Amino acid sequence: MLDIHHGDNLDVLARLGDASFDLIYIDPPFNTGRAQTRTSWKATRVAKGGRVAFNGARYTQVRTGSSSFSDVFDDYLGFLGPRLVEARRLLTPTGSLFVHLDFREVHYAKVMLDQLFGRSSFINEIIWAYDYGGRTNKRWSPKHDNILWYARDPRHFTFNVGATDRVPYLAPGLAGAEKAARGKVPTDTWWHTIVSPTGKEKTGYPTQKPLGILERIVRVHSNPGDRLLDFFAGSGSFGDAADRNGRDCVLVDSSRTAIAVMKRRFKGRPVQLHTTESRSTRSRREK
């Protein structure tokens, strides 16, 4: 079951019970200092003009829409901190929190998480590496994201390593034929392409993360029937990964665009939709 909540995540989190989630993953805004925008395109066959495909057919691209959100914060940690406090409260004794960021804020967030959870509760930093997009000649081009893993209790947490997908050896000739055919358990560096702008997985939502990354987290760090949470849900990819693997998931986002994307994405699946009035709106109405 997927529960989708439309509202400020801090208001929604306050209504959820203590120790009620086995796994929490969040992909908050990265504080890039600019608007994040994704434009959707559809290829349409034409008789003349346009571009020529491999089979000789001609097509043109038609813009079908776009979505965007502001990614600018004057006090980023002041925004994120109260939500991380709530996340810790919501974790079960064997639960884990995954915080997906990039180079801009990850180091500051880690210091705050160390203070909140305790340094011993920091288990791993996972590097998601990809090779796509623009480059710069002014510095080394950043081509990775950082995912911080914290356990509610560093002595007891779910880690089903046997449930993970296996990846190819970088030097299969050195591993031997049998090992090369079987592949290896991933390390803390995960090479995975971004969501293709023209692939079936795309939703048109900015900053959408690939299912391959999220399904690995779901399978290894939770069990079938567990309850999961993503309170920066965006396009709903974490909920999709949870649902595909037999987990219940609560998804929260304040963006109408995100809610619309998730409603389209999960059409035909068992979904409950809730709207939570913000505290500021409620206080204005009650005056």
Where are these regions (language model features)?
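Core catalytic lobe of class I
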Residues: 1-270
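SAM-dependent methyltransferase catalytic region
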Residues: 2-3, 265-287
